[in-house]
């Protein structure tokens, strides 16, 4: 009888496991299909484009051959011939990333802690900091440029683009501060939710020991959200090569603001949809492939540094 009961139990368990398996596969099927189509297939096509050229006569792309097979990759290192400074693009992109990490992450953690502790006007700060993430970026750009920067420029007697003149020394710092501000929302949301996972007993123990708010943040809360901070920083490395700092919203084509351009702005501007940019697609694919290789290497290096720091 025991064997019969055991066999029946195994059949029930088998049916249950099959149902669980069917539910699991049905659940992950759509994301897997999306990953295959929009990542693997799209990127595979980008890799192929790196070894192609646009033929104006046939209005299509044809493969390069012979000595010209790697022509697009050699053109990547000759962007100066297009009136652009590759070194300047890299420098601006790295400065943008460093400032975003340094002056974006730290204030975001502080504001998140303030909201988490539910101090005075915390709801207002939560709304105010997250608002830029809800409003369309082009609307924010219009308001910022048309009603704030232009107003100050007129007061100072500046003409043209005023403080946002791409040839001036004020454009890049102003746009950098603006971008950091509108980027607060997502970080504050994630850090606040991560802080909510910290055990309340730890906070209470710290308060009983007489810890100040600063010590609660640095010794109790911050260690609990360190993995989230690390993830944000590592993921943001890819932004070095994709972040355009909303420059396209302000200036449009990259040749209107070459001195403050970033790698992301360059790629976005040169690969913007339209027949006039078809000729740029192979070069941008090769450029993106080079950036991907550097980004993968940088991610591994930073991740390894974090692991050493944790030890």
Task: Mark where each language-model region is.
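Short, Lys/Arg-rich, polar N-terminal cytosolic tail immediately upstream
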Residues: 1-18
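A structural signal for multi-pass alpha-helical bundles of membrane permease subunits
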Residues: 16-311
